[in-house]
Amino acid sequence: MNLFFFQNCISPHQIPFIEELSVFTDVDRVVVIAPRVDYDDRKLMGWKASNLLKVSNVEFIIASSVDQVKKLYESCKGEDTYCFFSGINAFAEVVSWMKLSLNYPFKRGVITEPPLLYHYPLWQHSLRFALKDWKYVKHFNYLLVMGDEFVNYYRFWSKRWKVLPFIYCTEWKERTLPVPITEKLKVLYVGSFSDRKNVVA
């Protein structure tokens, strides 16, 4: 079995679980495909995605052309292959690789964030989905959505695909921190204050 993961960049929130997939006996090949390793703004936030390229038993293709991905697809003709696409609506490269995959008898999945409702109500997301995405649903076997709140929303659109709640993950490293001796409450927020995060100050 081949497992291919298409992303806009190498993600520290996905590589830890992707690396673990290679230990299963029926998995022959795990490949991560992205047009770039990282973005400059994410490097400034502390991302060190280039270090993730060193994980064992995972191939990385930093693809600058559709031909590179086509060559990968061609190498798997007749093999049990699963393609998982992240950012399918947001990144042109991922969209083109998804469309190219439709020429092959692969099984497909989407890894997606749920609809973000702080800018647009759900009915507008539904309208966009019906107009833009519905035509592709028949080509997908799985949809992995972050959290469980919108599992039923995606199940509504099709009985064909299996919808599963999903989470991002990071590599676990054991840490020992001294317990502060103080009566003051201290709160540490780790994250960005971008509108997309919907942090209410």
State where each predicted segment sits.
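Short hydrophobic "strand-cap" motifs at the C-terminus of beta-strands
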Residues: 6, 146, 189-193
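N-terminal strand-loop element at the rim of the active site
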Residues: 8-12, 24-64, 77
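A conserved mid-protein helix/loop that constitutes part of the nucleotide-sugar donor-binding site
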Residues: 12-19, 194-201
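An aromatic- and histidine-rich active-site surface loop
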Residues: 12-15, 82-106, 110-112
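Membrane-proximal helix-turn-helix segments that form the acceptor-binding/catalytic region
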Residues: 102-103, 125-143, 156
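A short, histidine- and acid-enriched strand-loop-helix "catalytic/donor-clamping" loop
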Residues: 108-126, 139-142, 172
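Helix-loop-beta element that forms the nucleotide-linked donor phosphate-binding surface
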Residues: 151-170, 177-180
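Conserved donor-binding/catalytic core segment of Leloir-type glycosyltransferases
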Residues: 180-197
